[in-house]
Amino acid sequence: MFTLKKSLLLLFFLGTINLSLCEQERNAEEERRDEPDERNAEVEKRFLPIVGKLLSGLSGLLGK
């Protein structure tokens, strides 16, 4: 039981480090972007599918 706890703690620790490194890399990539057009395009890509799903859901509710 003790070795299981140790290995789980080790996996958690390594996963946390990996997540931290990924966040740092992502933040560095976001800082490298200088053009606001690229940021706007990325926001639109994230935003438009959500709006489409909401509108289709509302039209389904209103149509009944």
UniProtKB/Swiss-Prot annotation:
Keyword Signal tagged: yes
Modified residues (Leucine amide): L62
Record-level GO cellular component terms: extracellular region
Residues that make up the propeptide removed upon maturation: 23-46
Tissue-specificity statement: Expressed by the skin glands.
Keywords: Amidation, Amphibian defense peptide, Antibiotic, Antimicrobial, Cleavage on pair of basic residues, Cytolysis, Fungicide, Hemolysis, Immunity, Innate immunity, Secreted, Signal
Parts of the chain that traverse the membrane: none
Example GO BP: innate immune response
Disulfide-linked positions: none
Entry-linked Pfam families: FSAP_sig_propep
Subcellular location: Secreted
Signal peptide location: 1-22
Predominant subcellular localization, coarse grouping: secreted
Family statement drawn from the similarity comment of this UniProt entry: Belongs to the frog skin active peptide (FSAP) family. Temporin subfamily.
Function recorded in the entry: Antimicrobial peptide with activity against Gram-positive and Gram-negative bacteria and against fungi. Has been tested against S.aureus (MIC=2.0 ug/mL), E.coli (MIC=3.0 ug/mL), B.dysenteriae (MIC=1.5 ug/mL), and C.albicans (MIC=6.5 ug/mL). Can regulate or mediate antimicrobial response by stimulating mast cell degranulation. Induces histamine release. Shows cytotoxicity toward solid tumor cell line HepG2. Also shows a weak hemolytic activity.
Protein name (database record): Temporin-ALa
Organism: Amolops loloensis (Lolokou Sucker Frog)
